[in-house]
Amino acid sequence: MQVNKALIRDDSVKNMNKSSAPLSSQVVPLILLTGIFFLNFISRIILAPLMPTIENDLGIGHGEAGALFFLISLGYFAALMGSGFFSYHLTHRKTIILSSMVSGAALFAISISHTMWGIRLGLLIVGMAAGIYLPSGLSTLTSLVRSRDWGKAIAIHEMAPNFGFVVAPLLSEILLIWFSWRYILILLGVVSVSSGLAFACFGRGGKFPGEYPRPGILRVLMVDPSFWIMVALFSLGIGASIGIYSILPLYLVAERGMLRSWANYLVAISRISVLGIAFLSGVVTDRLGPKVAMGGVFLGTGLATFLLGVVPQSWIVLIVFLQPMMAACFFPPGFSALSRIGPPRVRNISLSFTYPLAFLLGGGAIPAGIGALGEMGFFDLGISLVGGIVMSGLILLHYLQLPEE
């Protein structure tokens, strides 16, 4: 066991891929990776703004429509946990290209399918294609850029999903003026395939294999306290961002008495401010280190989330804008810390197991718990409790051990 652990932890940051370089020299591959991640993310959420049109066109109800989102999530998390098998046999670079190509092909297949089973299968494949990207994308990114610039590089990469939240509804509304939802999926599929070809021609890095979850590696991870601490920290980070985002419109309408249209508009525009603040978090991460940066994030996010449940009505709009800005700051230091656990070859394993487990807790259990308290008449208490739980991340950080930079 000690030999295996030494293998996994051996100079995780110092023995970086020889291509590691300053961030300024890796702008083109970083932009390509961020663009692929953006398309990867938007392909999973584009159905949300298109769904009213899709329901009318296919003659399905809300329940069946909701099941379509479940299929995307099922494919995503299954592929994410098994992504190591792809990167082990193909290398990270080819896995990224495969993700873009298959996602684009699946979107095209959905657009021409006229049976529900064909659409369901296509959405499952879209989720799976998206799921194999993230571990390989981050492994490639951290192999290209020197460790002192990881925070900024990851912050740029993490702009993709935040930008996707803003672009998806706007893009859908604009294109629906001229095209049906099927042509929108075709367009997105073509752009996705094109991004894969662009990375194949102009992208760099990732020319090394990942590791698949072999019993020996899994055994080392499962007994490593840092792995479980990172699962807990990511659960808190995801819970404060996606978890609160999922339940916030309902809270604003049911507990704060807002009109539904105003609540949805407020939540949507509050995401715009997140785009720039994440990069600032990356700069702080590079200057102070991921542990210090995460400490500030958990304190600020926990306090903002707590206030979301207790401030008077006159302050609620300000807090709705402040809370996601603080929550988005978690991911640059969070992924930077996670990327320091293990050498480049095995980093994808920690990510492919940390993120799904954390999402189930932060993105599933936390909003479900808030909703349950809301049913009992304690909606505001549920929100504030999450704020207190997020601040407990400060205690966990004390026990997190990261390799020296």
Task: Briefly describe each language-model feature range.
Residues 79-91, 278-289, 374:
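Helix-to-loop junctions at the C-terminal end of transmembrane segments
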Residues 15-23, 205-230:
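Juxtamembrane intracellular "pre-TM" segments in multi-pass secondary transporters
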Residues 291-334:
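C-terminal transmembrane helical hairpin of 12-TM major facilitator-type secondary transporters
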Residues 47-48, 226-274:
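Extracytoplasmic gate region of multi-pass secondary transporters
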Residues 78-114:
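Conserved MFS/SLC helix-loop-helix module at the cytosolic interface between two early adjacent transmembrane helices
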Residues 345-376:
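A late C-terminal transmembrane helix in Major Facilitator Superfamily
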Residues 157-200:
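Helix-loop-helix hairpin linking two adjacent transmembrane segments in secondary transporters
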Residues 122-160:
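Cytoplasmic helix-loop-helix junction between adjacent transmembrane helices
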